Amino acid sequence: MSKKIKKENLFISTQQDAQQAQILMPGQEQLQFRVEDTFKCPIYLADKPEWVDTLNKASDPIIERVRKNWKKKIKDPKDSTKQMPNSLHSELLWQYPEFKEIANLILQQSWNILHWQGYNLTGKLPMLTELWVQEFPEEGGFHDIHEHGNNHISGFYFLKCNEKTSHPVFHDPRPGKKMTDLQMRDPSKLNYGSGQVHYKVKPGQFIFFN
């Protein structure tokens, strides 16, 4: 005759309010943890509104040329293009003198950030791999989650935006966390368990990240 084995729940799911102490195993003391924030993922924000007008003046003709080129492709019966793209994207801008100042600032700030993060930059100089202006349609536009390969620093400088403008969304880069993630109690609040964060943007705002 087999003996019936009593099964116990090793993981107790509570329905307590978020403000109450969460007790998984009755009678166990609550440890007073010392929390150390290691492997941080900083995002750097700064404002330089005095460049907006000058850079808009330099960028507008470039975007308009890109727009006209796309319209020509759509009208060309020999071209397979049928509609405008999700965004208007310029060529590399460091070749133009109007963008030399912002290019130099990006290089210097990128070096500073990597230095602050503890990297050994002795004998190393930063190099731009990409620099472009991009315009999304008023109806809205978006990019899926992606990365820019072989770049130690990426960033934005916002020229035209308002309270309705789409905002950049940053995702937790740790693949292990993504594979085992749990549902958040309140996704609107930024917490240790949050998987993404976004920032409202304004003209003249820099955002650097890596």
Model-derived features: where do they sit?
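Non-heme Fe(II)/2-oxoglutarate
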Residues: K3-N120, F142
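Catalytic core of non-heme Fe(II) oxygenases with the double-stranded beta-helix
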Residues: V133-I207
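Sequence-level motif detector for i,i+2 pairs with an aromatic at +2
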Residues: K40-I43, L128, T165, G204
